[in-house]
Amino acid sequence: MRHEHLAPGAMVLRQFAAPEGAALLAGIEGVTVHAPFRHMITPGGFRMSVGMTNCGPLGWVTDKTGYRYDAVDPVSGLPWPPMPDVFRRLATGAAANAGFNEYVPDACLVNRYEPGSRLTLHQDRNEKDFDQPIISVSLGLPAVFLFGGFERSDRAARVEVTHGDVVVWGGPSRLRYHGVLPLKEGRHPLVGVYRINLTFRKAG
């Protein structure tokens, strides 16, 4: 495994999740049986291009009333599915490898990208504790991850992430802007025409 430094408190752990790829995909399949992917609506009324769902005690949601974490899936009215053990172990291990010990996530946002799907530059500000890092796991098709500064207008580094790569950012880099360029077409032997991203956070 290779560590690639991005900024103070931020790095890419190349291929860190690759050995658990099949188990992670099985976990995602189990989660989506109970909480299928959906395209959420932003407060401005726009439909997000990325399909989303959640697992764990808290789930990130957006609708016309705003962005927030909720213990209940607004589609089913039921609690989000439990976070699979393999998810939690991976997130905790990645955090420790990046120097963030005793990290225990309580939210996992599962994003499914189709060709053309993107995520515009944004900060993660809905969490209660900014001392806890963000863990981002890439599965499936490669993508270009944007890692910017502390203003939306700051120049963003373009970082290619492939199946099994994990990006960790926290500490002085916790509130940096980040996003994903539109996904290019392709086919991955395990994930097909999609890229799936797991984003772990300590939200509550």
Q: For each predicted feature, which ranges?
A:
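Non-heme Fe(II) oxygenase metal-center motifs and adjacent flexible, charged/small-residue loops
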Residues: 1-204
